[in-house]
A protein has these predicted regions:
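Conserved NTP-donor binding/palm subdomain of two-metal-ion nucleotidyltransferases/polymerases, i.e.
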Residues: 1-114, 120-173
Length: 173
């Protein structure tokens, strides 16, 4: 593990405890690598929150971090509204990963999620597909895979509708 990878884990750990790291100043190159790695793993807001007090404010990283957290908050709002509409329609998918995992973080919207995952039975897929298309969610033409992606028009909300939890063809499961 590289020194920057170790610092990433240290910053994430501090963030989860609501603390800041206390490091000697890192070089601009090291900070860039740290923030890049955090961005790749979708934890930039968490890492930046723990790091900026000891390393100084980086306006560009701060803006990216804040934008990511705000976008996540809007996606969460859109998702919760969609779930409410599903419940009104007597549709009750199992929510897995995403919003559930974010509840483990002190500030859930700082843990960016690329998508929300819903698990349904294969038999109910046509019902959910119809509901989604009637509620401004779009997808591609291939509806056969074990998971079908949907994007809410005008939103960053991206949903993967799973017909099974794992790929049946996968040798890992």
């Amino acid at each position: 593990m590289t020194e920057i990878q170790e610092k990433l884990l240290e910053a994430l750990s501090a963030s989860l405890k609501g603390e800041s790291v206390e490091w000697e100043p890192l070089s601009q190159e090291e900070l860039s690598e740290l923030y890049n790695l955090a961005h790749i793993h979708q934890i930039l807001p968490l890492v930046y929150e723990a790091v900026y007090k000891s390393q100084g404010v980086n306006p560009q990283v701060k803006a990216i971090s804040m934008r990511a957290a705000m976008t996540q908050a809007l996606s969460t709002r859109d998702f919760l509204q969609l779930v409410s509409k599903m419940n009104e329609a007597k549709l009750y998918p199992l929510v897995v990963k995403g919003i559930i995992a974010r509840k483990l973080y002190p500030i859930p919207d700082e843990r960016v999620s690329g998508d929300e995952d819903l698990l349904i039975t294969k038999e109910l897929f046509p019902t959910y597909h119809q509901f989604f298309t009637e509620h401004n969610l779009v997808t591609g033409d291939d509806l056969e895979p074990y998971e079908v992606p949907y994007q809410l028009k005008g939103s960053s909300l991206y949903i993967e509708l799973h017909k099974t939890l794992f790929q049946e063809e996968s040798v890992a499961y």
